[in-house]
Design a protein with these regions (language model features):
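Alpha-helical segment of the N-proximal tetratricopeptide repeat
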Residues: 24-50, 54
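Canonical positions in the second alpha-helix
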Residues: 51, 84-85, 118-119
């Protein structure tokens, strides 16, 4: 009888712990997103990073981190986070768009062309951005 009560107690405790842990994962992302929307990028970066610790496949946290690093003009970390988003979800249009812009900026034109082709094949929401990307690439190529 005592063993049964002990087992039930342990299972109940584990259940509550896992539920609390799942809620904290969502809280980190939600807090980070609110801070980002309020332009508190340094604070939001901390919570996005914390969300990634508990949820390493959080493509949205990586995407927001890339946007933060873009604002900080840290091209390497922006690129790393965008590449991580695309590893997690190769059809993430916003990541493809931002990575294309970054590659045009870095004069990596072959990669930019490849990403525009990818964007063309996967686009659903951001198809209107493809001509803009092509124009940026073409104008940069003409000026070189």
């Amino acid at each position: 009888m005592k063993k049964n009560i002990l087992i039930i107690f342990i299972l109940f405790s584990l259940s509550n712990y896992s539920q609390a842990n799942a809620n904290s994962k969502n809280t980190y992302y939600e807090n980070a997103k609110k801070l980002f929307e309020n332009k508190k990028y340094k604070n939001s970066k901390f919570f996005f990073e914390k969300d990634i610790v508990f949820n390493p496949k959080s493509e949205n946290s990586y995407l927001y981190l890339a946007k933060i690093f873009k604002g900080e003009m840290n091209d390497n970390l922006e690129e790393n986070n965008l590449n991580t988003v695309l590893l997690l979800n190769p059809k993430n249009e916003e990541a493809i768009y931002l990575l294309t812009l970054l590659n045009v900026k870095k004069s990596n034109f072959s990669k930019a062309k490849e990403l525009i082709t990818t964007m063309t094949s996967v686009c659903k929401k951001m198809c209107s951005k493809i001509p803009e990307l092509q124009e940026k690439l073409d104008s940069t190529l003409k000026s070189k």
